[in-house]
Amino acid sequence: MKKPVKNIKKQKAQNQTKNIKKQLKEEVNTGLIDGIFVYTEPLSILEFATKINKPVTVILKHYFNQGLLLNQNTLLTEEQMGELCLEFGFDFKKETSVTKENILETLLDTVDDEKHLKERPPIVTIMGHVDHGKTTLLDSIKNSNVVASEAGGITQAIGAYQITTKNNKKITFIDTPGHEAFTEMRSRGANVTDIVVLIVAADDGVMPQTEEAIDHAKLANVPIIVFINKIDKPGSDPNRVKTELMKYGLVAEEFGGDIPFIEGSAIKKINLDKLEDTIILISELENLKANPDRFASGVVLEAHLDKAKGPVASVLVQQGSLEIKDIMVVGTTFGSIKHIEDEFKHKVLKAEPSKPVVVYGLNQVPKAGDKFVVINDEKMAREISEAQLKKQQEEERRTKQAFTLDAIKQHIDEGELKNITLIIKADTQGSVEALKNSLSKINISGVKINIIRASVGAISLSDISLASTVRDGLVIVYGFNVRPDAIVRKKAEEDRIEIRLHNIIYKLIEELEDAAKGILDPEIKEVVLGQAQVRALFRHSAIGTIGGFYVVDGAITRNAKIRVIRNGVVVYDGEINSLQHQKQDAKEVKAGFEGALTIKNFNDIKEGDIFEAYKLEQVK
């Protein structure tokens, strides 16, 4: 006689709790084990000597011979312990003790036995330029694959939906409002996409957001399908699109590449079935599988607070099956799931891998990109959630980016820094090419320099979002004759992204090389005091052009340096000649007020220009 499903689930919950408690109790054996030194954390010289059965004086003498006077209580770094292990002739390995702070990662990294894995639907994100038909393509796919009576009933709040093709295959589409949402989740370590469909209009070709989409797709390291849209429009030229995309490394199969290109029309539903078939084919080649018979885990797509229903989260199940009454731990949040519904607001009893659903019952609103795990023991779930909160608070006190340009010499010498990732924004394509060429010639021993974006234009929020996805090493956004605005600067500060600004190529290159050699000059920090928009122009025969402005951020001060920015590009950098407020000489004009100024040796001011006041300070 079969056990009731309820009892089976209860037994599974008990087994899961026992397993978690066992992992938390298990201690990692450290010290010399079979010729390998095993450790979990940095040790003092005395602790290290004891574990390798050596007199502490031997280690102190080793450092004395190197000119270092240490004592037995000096804490050794992981690199120093590694060097000592090699000195004494044995290998070394770091093990991680399982704690309530990291148990979620342990559970998420659980590898299932192959025999428990079953085929799952692919998860697809459509990306591309804003006017190239992404929304139309999503709508056409939705309406072609759902029952007519429900075609208009898909809620946009879920952030994803699942279709069933004519061949009875399921595909999940992530419906993101822009590249930022996709990037934000990746910056939090959540890789949710299996395949990216890049949509490009046949009559328009590659546009700035197309380039951004390519950058994001390549960083996600997933297969790309190109859908050339609007082939029904006059002036469409699919071959031009294929040629343009070649310089980004996207070469069509017909030209000897490995990227599938599909020519179609979203609005007229031309070749949508071919697109779906290609997605299914690639998913089969990728061998996408998951175990549906374990406790669920996955990622939050979107979340908000509903005044009537409380915290509401759209989630994507990646492993296991999510059911009502499951207790979900999501980052620092947890709760018993009271209700699950799909994109049609239909009640869902069980959500299997690749299924997007909306859940109710968490005690707080989670963040997009947070990973969740079902732990069906309320006491344990609460304790783990509290531990996650403590861990998050500690991490927030630390700097997000461990490396800065000023200190990379030390990190390179200690073997901590292996990658320097650059985003380059410049005033002209010629500047972009010159910078890429010069940077490619830099040789820093043991360090790889990666340029993940190099394009024309002002430093934007998209650049900062892309930089935030880099998980390894140092990332720098370089601006050459271009500037970030106040919103971008604030976002960069919040995300701990370093922005460096230059107007001479060799100085930019020199700065990077000198930093690697540890001979970087004392840092001169630029402090932006304020920005103002030019709203009126006045001509004066004696003093030249007067720019009437409105201060949008900070203040414009009389003794500050001033630069003129036009469409994100610096057109002049100099000094203020005169500053007035209400036709009176002024020392400063603050945000929310109007003023007027003249600039020494510069009269080519235009309406819409941005005045940026700044000063230079040496960092102590």
Curated annotation (Swiss-Prot):
Annotated region (G1), positions in chain: 128-135
Region (G5): 265-267
UniProt keywords, alphabetically: Cytoplasm, GTP-binding, Initiation factor, Nucleotide-binding, Protein biosynthesis
Gene Ontology terms for molecular function: GTP binding; GTPase activity; translation initiation factor activity
PROSITE patterns reported for this sequence: G_TR_2
The family this protein is said to belong to: Belongs to the TRAFAC class translation factor GTPase superfamily. Classic translation factor GTPase family. IF-2 subfamily.
Job description of the protein: One of the essential components for the initiation of protein synthesis. Protects formylmethionyl-tRNA from spontaneous hydrolysis and promotes its binding to the 30S ribosomal subunits. Also involved in the hydrolysis of GTP during the formation of the 70S ribosomal complex.
Entry-linked HAMAP family: IF_2_B
A GO CC annotation given for this chain: cytosol
Name of this chain's protein: Translation initiation factor IF-2
Residues that bind GTP: 128-135, 175-179, 229-232
Region spans: G2: 153-157
Major location (coarse): cytoplasm
Start and end residues of each stretch annotated as G4: 229-232
Lineage: Bacteria, Bacillati, Mycoplasmatota, Mollicutes, Mycoplasmataceae
Subcellular compartments: Cytoplasm
UniProt keyword Phosphoprotein, yes or no: no
tr-type G domain segment(s): 119-288
InterPro entries, A to Z: EF-G-like_DII, IF2_II, IF2_N, P-loop_NTPase, Small_GTP-bd, T_Tr_GTP-bd_dom, TF_IF2_bacterial-like, TIF_IF2
One Pfam family it belongs to: IF-2
